[in-house]
């Protein structure tokens, strides 16, 4: 009787999860106005219902955007983007854990920026499964310099489970409500690069920027995964914050290949003194050598 009861409980839990999953996928189909055939594929076969992964078609625009924002040579940035796209070892490691191809999307821009600027401390607020963290940690490993502090409300192994063991030597994970854990982190760390990829509500994103503002060193870079075009009405949270802090803001939208998602806006903010000196050539780079 006990076995039957447990079996029925597991069955009901599985059925409830499947209903929830179908509901999420139907929401996606409606929100993104997915064509009928692709909608059926999403409903029946896609394992992803959010945090979609895909390759992008406009990597050339990405290197141009990063060069425009930072003043770093475009060819250097394009080279770093090609580096991660062609890193067969990294792709094989992640694909083996992910059970599907590793598609970084806009995160290749994070990689290129880290390779070029060599930050000592990167903070990613909102790690999720760790795909972005893999790109960040790979860049830090190539630099032989720096560490990543990942934050998420969900503890491991639910978060950051994609990260291969050899990349974890530069990784620190902080579980808990970011509204509570971020202030304590700022008191003990000098954040060179902050990536907002957590709760995308305006209130929560603004809270993160408010917390980090007094602790950002000169030359710090702030990235948002949910920005909007420059001058958008209303402006996105990162642009508003950048204006308030007299910082430079720019953004770019990725173009997913073969996916119904329209692509995220990659926003970046840095000191105006960096972008205005020597035609943007004043971007801070950590020159510590391995």
Predicted features and spans:
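S-adenosylmethionine/decaboxylated-SAM
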Residues: 10, 96-290
